[in-house]
Amino acid sequence: KIICISYMAEGWKKPKSLIWDSKQDDKKLLNEFVKIINQYPIVIGQNGDSFDLKVMRGRTWAQASNPLPDVITLDTLKMSRQNMRLTSHKLDWKSRLIGRGGKMSTDFQLWIDVEKSNKKALTHMVKYCEQDVLELQAVFWSMLPYCNRLPLHLGALILGHQDSCPGCASTNRIKNKTRQTRTGLRQQWHCKDCGRYWTDTRRIK
C-alpha cells in the first residue's frame, strides 16, 4: 500500500502530503491524488516513470479507484542518464553535488514502525517524502539548462508556441549565432533566464 504521497506545484513554498487513513487504507489518498495530478500538464519525478507512476497505477487498479490520467512526464533519472556521465544518477548524490543536503536518512525499521501505527514514525516518513520533493525541485531546475535531449519543448507545451526557451519556457531570449545544417540555415538562441542554448527547428528563410 502507499503510505503517503508528497507533491509540490512550481511556485509553492513547501510541499503538501496525502496520508493513508487510520485503517491504513490508501483508496482515499489515491482518489485525491488522481484529481490533483489531473490539474497539471507536466509531472516531474526522479525515476517516476519506472517506479512512482507504475506503483500508483497498480494500487488504483487494486483498489478499483479512478485511474491515473495520461500525463506528460519529465524524469530526472532519465534526463541525467541521457545527457550526462555522472558518478551516480541517484537523487541524493545529485542533490549533494549541487551543494544541498541530500535525502533524509532512513532505514527499513521506519516502514515497520509505520505499519505498527507509530505516529512518530509516520511523521518522520512524511518529512522524508517532502524532503525528497524539495531536493527534486532543486536538482531539476539546476540540471535543466544542461540537458539538450528533452522529450518535449517546455515552452511550446506551456505557452503554445516555440518562440520561447524549450527548457524553462522563458521568452527572455537573444539570438546567439546561426548554424548551417543539412536541411538549411537555422537560428541558435540563448535563454537569459536559465542560460540554455538551443537551435530553432525552423529554417531561416
Question: Model-flagged regions — what are they?
Answer:
Residues 11-93:
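Conserved DEDDh/DEDDy metal-dependent 3′-5′ exonuclease domain
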Residues 158-162, 185-186:
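Flanking scaffold residues of small Cys/His-coordinated metal-binding clusters
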Residues 192-205:
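Short metal-binding segments enriched for Cys and/or His
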